[in-house]
Amino acid sequence: MSTYTRPVMLLLCGLLLLTLAIAVLNTLVPLWLAQANLPTWQVGMVSSSYFTGNLVGTLFTGYLIKRIGFNHSYYLASLIFAAGCVGLGVMVGFWSWMSWRFIAGIGCAMIWVVVESALMCSGTSHNRGRLLAAYMMVYYMGTFLGQLLVSKVSGELLHVLPWVTGMILAGILPLLFTRIVNQQTQARHSSSISAMLKLRQARLGVNGCIISGIVLGSLYGLMPLYLKHQGMANASIGFWMAVLVSAGILGQWPMGRLADKFGRLLVLRVQVFVVILGSIAMLTQAAMAPALFILGAAGFTLYPVAMAWACEKVEHHQLVAMNQALLLSYTVGSLLGPSFAAMLMQNYSDNLLFIMIASVSFIYLLMLLRNAGQTPNPVAHI
């Protein structure tokens, strides 16, 4: 049976369009608020409302999938995201935009839960690494193309909203031509997010998603600031960030393939060790290109491998709840990491960004080197 079936390919096509829209809005919303002369703290609050919506959307999407299935959950999530987009054109203001970005955050989180859960339920323990790698490649490619679009088209609010909304609605179309079966509805027992978080045999996967959130959130949010403080121009900062993201895209498929072939535990150990090496290399500032490349290739691929690890440890009908738990863990890490790293950078030194990344990675490596409880035959083997 092919790994990349027709439903999987159509799902990824829809995700690409939605990710383009997400990337464009995440870039332009802070700029629109700044043009409206809102103070910096209000711009930050609007951004926080989006991430708060992510948390809320993550919590209830599993119940929705169980009730109405993957396809209808995907349609609803896309419509909620589109509503959050259209609402931005109603009135530019702090409270209005904070509400609409909260709604958009819910829709985006629902999309991620639906897509990730559908991919995991479509795969087996032998190919989930490749499926999640394809998912991350599409996600990062959409993010990259979204940034490219921002630089090529008019950034005016009322010029952007119509075609971005159209792109969101177009993202629904591929799923109209296929049906993704939700086998969870046939299960006798439902699983909760809290139960998945407490599952001892999957704890390394959950911890891996938290660490991945810390690493990626810190790199995404604070690497441009670090480079700016090194005296680089905006063009140079853009180049080095492109190197970082490109490495993450290029590393997805090989890491997924290696994880499926040699086991997720071994690959996780190697990934985390390489993240530590890349962080140390950044501190030396001797060879930034290879240091950033290996940091991106290992750091950006940690999340899908950790997800695949955790999903090996649960029954098939528990996959959606487990995915919610993993996405929630990643979101928490991506919120906490940049906040803590920014505080360290402001009060002490910019180099503490990489010291913090290396430190949390080292702690996770110690966990991985202990008895991981890996079983020769994964539970979720179908």
From Swiss-Prot:
Source species, domain of life: Bacteria
A Pfam family per the record: MFS_1
Annotated GO MF terms: transmembrane transporter activity
CDD domains: MFS_YcaD_like (cd17477)
Keyword DNA damage: no
Membrane-related topology note: Multi-pass membrane protein
Membrane-spanning ranges: 8-28, 45-65, 75-95, 102-122, 131-151, 157-177, 204-224, 231-251, 270-290, 291-311, 325-345, 349-369
Any one of the GO CC terms: plasma membrane
Localization of this protein: Cell inner membrane
Swiss-Prot/TrEMBL keywords: Cell inner membrane, Cell membrane, Membrane, Transmembrane, Transmembrane helix, Transport
NCBIfam families membership: PRK03633.1
Family (UniProt): Belongs to the major facilitator superfamily. YcaD (TC 2.A.1.26) family.
Protein name: Uncharacterized MFS-type transporter YcaD
Species name: Salmonella paratyphi B (strain ATCC BAA-1250 / SPB7)
